[in-house]
Amino acid sequence: MIMRPSKRAANELRPLSFTTQFTRYAEGSVLVTLGNTKVICNASIVEGVPRFLKNSEQGWLTAEYGMLPRSTHSRMDREASRGKQGGRTVEIQRLIGRSLRAALDLKLLGPYTITIDCDVIQADGGTRTAAINGSCIAMIEALRHLQRKGILQTDPLKHKVAAVSVGIYKGVPVLDLDYAEDSNAHTDMNVVMTDNDAFIEIQGTAEGDAFHAKELDALINLARHGIKQIIEKQQEALS
C-alpha cells in the first residue's frame, strides 16, 4: 500500500468528465477534464481527402495537438513563435490520429476528412490520453452530424476508443498518473484500446529500473480496468 499524492487507490482514476458541444462551430466539440488536466477536442469535417488518397474511395482522419502557453506551471513559448513543432507534439498528434483511425471504417466515411484539434488548456499529466478520450466523443459527434445531414447512410464507426496511463510509482503499479507521479515514476506506459477489449497501442518505458513480465501484466490489467470505466463515461456523454 502506498500513499499517492492525490490520495487515490492504486487502481483509481482521477475524476473524469466530458462536456459535449463545448464550442459553437465545430461539428464535434468536447471539453475533457481528467483531474486537473483539461483539453478541448474539436472535430471538423471537410469534403476531400489528402493527395495520397486520391481515387482511393476512402476518407481520412488526422489530428493536431498543442498546449496553451500557460497550461503548465510556468509559461512556455507557442510553437508557432519558434517556427516549428517539437518532437513531443508530433509524436502525440500522430498517436491521436492512429488511435482514432483504428475506430473507423474509412471506406464508409467516403470522400471526407475529419481533422481533430486538441488544445491543452491545463496540464497535470495524462494530456495525450485525455485528448484521445475526448477526441473519440468529438469524432462521434461529427459523424452524427454527417448522418443527420443525410451524407452518411452507414455509420463508419467500428469501435469506441479510450486511453489511459499506467506506471510503477514507488514500486507499485498505479493507474492514471498525474504530473507528480509521472515525473517520479520508475515506469511510464500509455495504453490505447477499443471497446471490445482489443489493443491499439502500448507505449512503455522504464525510467530507472527495468520492469519484469509480471509487472507488465499488472500494468496491462490496470489499464484494461481503467479503460472500461472511461468507455462507460464516454457512453454516458454520448447518450
UniProtKB/Swiss-Prot annotation:
Which one GO biological process term can you cite for this protein?
A: tRNA processing
Name the residues that bind phosphate: 88, 126-128
Tell me which domain of life the UniProt entry assigns to the organism this sequence originates from.
Answer: Bacteria
In the record, what terms sit under GO molecular function?
3'-5'-RNA exonuclease activity; RNA binding; tRNA binding; tRNA nucleotidyltransferase activity
A Pfam family this chain is assigned to:
RNase_PH
Keywords (alphabetical) are:
Nucleotidyltransferase, RNA-binding, rRNA processing, Transferase, tRNA processing, tRNA-binding
Q: What does this protein do?
A: Phosphorolytic 3'-5' exoribonuclease that plays an important role in tRNA 3'-end maturation. Removes nucleotide residues following the 3'-CCA terminus of tRNAs; can also add nucleotides to the ends of RNA molecules by using nucleoside diphosphates as substrates, but this may not be physiologically important. Probably plays a role in initiation of 16S rRNA degradation (leading to ribosome degradation) during starvation.
Q: Which family does it belong to?
A: Belongs to the RNase PH family.
By what name is this protein known? Ribonuclease PH
What is the species of this protein? Coxiella burnetii (strain RSA 493 / Nine Mile phase I)
